[in-house]
Amino acid sequence: MRLVLLGAPGAGKGTQAVVISQKYNVPHISTGDIFRSNIKNGTELGRKAKEYIDKGLLVPDELTVDIVKDRISQPDCKAGFILDGFPRTIYQAERLDEILKELNVELDCALNIYVPDEEIIKRMSGRRVCSKCGMSYHIVYNQPKVENICDSCNGELIQRDDDKEETVIQRLNTYHKQTEPLIEYYEKKGKLLTVHGQEGVDDTTKEVLNALSGVKL
């Protein structure tokens, strides 16, 4: 299974990617995780990426394409992979096609998880993370026992810069302008599947697995 996950930030792509990864025994490749790791470790790539991420902008193509090419060329991707956060532009999608051609493989499908903007804003701006251990919470859906205090280590809960409402709105605007055209791109190639992700996680998972069961591998 070689799969691209599409959908606005906060649509639940990462959650569903874990399920799909376990079901099809292929690695989940999140460009967001790669960038966050580099930012945390203070690498040159991390410093460059942080400038864009903090403003709610996309990391430039040339920074992203090389990372993805290297990752999907690894032995554990021979049987497939799930790309989460890439491609985000038509140019990146075209570059991905070139990379796959070089590897003599094809993309099986692009799965689009659709969630309305209002729900995305509610989900993302309500996120909180522990400043000590990194555990995730939500002020509506997953509250700590004591407000703003981590259940596990008593660390202070903070809102990441890219989860602030004004940044979320900027990220959505960027998504609609630059990433949404990918839906049409993959639809024209006959690779697009769309599921609705505004219900609970379990309902979305059922819809995702049902949609993927019809993909010819």
Swiss-Prot record:
Keywords: ATP-binding, Cytoplasm, Kinase, Metal-binding, Nucleotide biosynthesis, Nucleotide-binding, Transferase, Zinc. AMP binds at residues 31, 36, 57-59, 85-88, 92, 160, 171. InterPro entries: Adenyl_kin_sub (IPR006259), Adenylat/UMP-CMP_kin (IPR000850), Adenylat_kinase_CS (IPR033690), Adenylate_kinase_lid-dom (IPR007862), P-loop_NTPase (IPR027417). It catalyses: AMP + ATP = 2 ADP. GO terms for biological process: AMP salvage. It is found in: Cytoplasm. Zn(2+) binds at residues 130, 133, 150, 153. One of its GO terms (molecular function) is zinc ion binding. Gene3D superfamilies: P-loop containing nucleotide triphosphate hydrolases. Belongs to the adenylate kinase family. Catalyzes the reversible transfer of the terminal phosphate group between ATP and AMP. Plays an important role in cellular energy homeostasis and in adenine nucleotide metabolism. NCBIfam families: adk, PRK00279.1-1, PRK00279.1-2, PRK00279.1-3, PRK14527.1. Consists of three domains, a large central CORE domain and two small peripheral domains, NMPbind and LID, which undergo movements during catalysis. The LID domain closes over the site of phosphoryl transfer upon ATP binding. Assembling and dissambling the active center during each catalytic cycle provides an effective means to prevent ATP hydrolysis. Some bacteria have evolved a zinc-coordinating structure that stabilizes the LID domain. Monomer. HAMAP family: Adenylate_kinase_Adk. This is Adenylate kinase. It comes from Acetivibrio thermocellus (strain ATCC 27405 / DSM 1237 / JCM 9322 / NBRC 103400 / NCIMB 10682 / NRRL B-4536 / VPI 7372) (Clostridium thermocellum).
